[in-house]
């Protein structure tokens, strides 16, 4: 099975995984897909896939591991998620594949599919482990990618893809503060923080 089968499924409307199972059970290709021959497969729109991983692009794509402290995925028209073990509280070990979720964006035109993917990536909130999201956002906005003039050397020859700030985790910090005040009756002030540091 092709790794990017979701892209093919989105533009053809054929569930490739289901078709393979049906064919293995003895159905014909026509019975499994609803298409009598190849000429009946009509391509509709454009799709692209992104693999969100726990790899750190600024550190030679070394996989990160640890506990996912927050996880919110993207949704919306034209967005398909094929997930793994990505959820708040999930533990990513060094012995596990770094893939968290595959995101496929479909739209009538390539530029709209790219815009949908960019929006979806901006909706993700993953905390506790490093991810490649900011790197992929840079890639999707890069003029060479948008002009469809990239080659297999694109990443190696485009250092500005790696220029991004790590996302700040303001939401979790605020929630931790509220929990400390509510549950532990702790109220941090600058004086209290100085005393605590010693």
PLM feature segments, named:
Residues 2-190:
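Catalytic cores of soluble metabolic enzymes centered on carboxylation/carboxyl-transfer
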Residues 188-198:
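Single conserved hydrophobic/aromatic residue that forms the stacking wall/gate
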